[in-house]
Amino acid sequence: MLHGLLDKTYVNKLKTSPSYSEESFAREYMSIWSGSSDDSWFNFDKLQKYRKIKNPETHAKFRPGSNQFYLISVDVGRINDQTVACVFRVNVDNTGKHWATLVNIKVLARSAETKTFTQQAIDVKRLIRDFQPREVVIDTNGLGVGLADEMIKAQYDEMGEYYMPYAFANDETYYAIQPKDAPKILYGLKANGPLNSKIHGNAYARLTSGMVRFLIKEQEAKNALMSTQIGQKMSVYKRVERLLPHEMTTKLFEEMANLRLKRTGNSTDIVLEQINARYPKDKYSSFAYGLWRIKEIEEEYTKRARRRFGGNGDGKRKLTFFT
């Protein structure tokens, strides 16, 4: 397709056929590597078993009686890079463990017209409207400052719809300039070298311990969808839209499989580099930022429980008996 050897109509027919597989199409027709390498830091094949979730979520679904919340994490891109938002549903069990489910991945700023930080802020605020998250994590190093500056302002979209400003709960540089009455749901993350090492280590630990669940593969989702009357009656556009979160999850897995441990002078630091330098890592960055903040929230939850109940934070009061 790159050299004009494949007809575009033929390619589109392939992609809409019942037997279409994103992975096989990428390998056979686009010469794109998929899968893992012996150098990969993450075990691609092992992680596949955590792809259990059949349906993505497009808005908040708060289940009665459950202790859950949503969290959105954003890795900011500009010009040639993508801005990626990962949407997590976090369920807290009786022991205080925070189990994460990646229910959607949104790529913002797909075209040149939507790459402005004003438009990206509107897109993030639409996600806030839909998912009512407890927090929105933004990497405020470098380019992220541009998005952060817009998030504390109000905007109107092309239809005249109003989007309210939000405020940072943890970044002192914004305290004096952000609206005093704006909801403080923004969390600024300044990912420098030492912190990045911890973020990578946390992502590895939570993934290998099975504390994260993902959407099933797009081919499985497509087969399930096409077995229903609703799926069969869907337009091609609606079908692609429905399956897109599954494809984005596969791309996240491919990005993780493309990361290897970089040799550094400091053996205690975890520094990851791309095996194929042309392959992006923005989805992984957004994903890892979210997992890091979930870990911090879990630790804060455990500390509060220990202060309240004593003991190990499992919600059971520790009693002392005297004789």
For every predicted segment, state its role.
Residues 73-82:
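Short acidic, Gly/Ser-rich segments with clustered Asp/Glu that frequently serve as metal-coordination loops
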Residues 1-74:
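ATPase catalytic-site recognition across NTP-hydrolyzing enzymes
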